[in-house]
Swiss-Prot record:
It comes from the Archaea. SUPFAM superfamilies: Peptide methionine sulfoxide reductase (SSF55068). The gene is msrA. Has an important function as a repair enzyme for proteins that have been inactivated by oxidation. Catalyzes the reversible oxidation-reduction of methionine sulfoxide in proteins to methionine. This is Peptide methionine sulfoxide reductase MsrA.
Amino acid sequence: MMCLSRYEKATFGAGCFWGVEDAFRKVDGVVSTRVGYMGGHLENPTYEDVCTGLTGHAEVVEVTFDPDVVGYSDLLDVFWSIHDPTTLNRQGPDVGEQYRSVIFYHSDEQRRAAIESRRRLEESGRFRDRIVTAIEPAGTFYEAEEYHQQYLEKNPRRRCYLMRLLSTR
């Protein structure tokens, strides 16, 4: 039985949520993941709504993790490694505000850690272009339709842009 009180949440948008979720599910200490939508103005959006680009929502992954096993800073490292944080509203062939690079923080501690990790990455020189990743307070999480949950596990022959990025690192 899980003791939920000791677990924490982290929410990330880094392009198509299928691949982002798949990457985080492989991290030791991640207890569960859910894909969904956050950061927009429409209540209870559907995938079709979000794909119009008119809702303001990002495709996100809500990560529930055990901080005794994996730290938030470790999750930030995964986040930075699985997408290009210098492309505005785009990851590979996926274009639109819903594919933006964004960290939704759940506490002041997460906000500070996210800002510091972005600063360190900017100073590292790893990316030639400016990092455009937004860091915003977490709002309402709207869970995506069931067929999107653990999509790449259910459909192992499918791939997305993120997976190609991971395979080259």
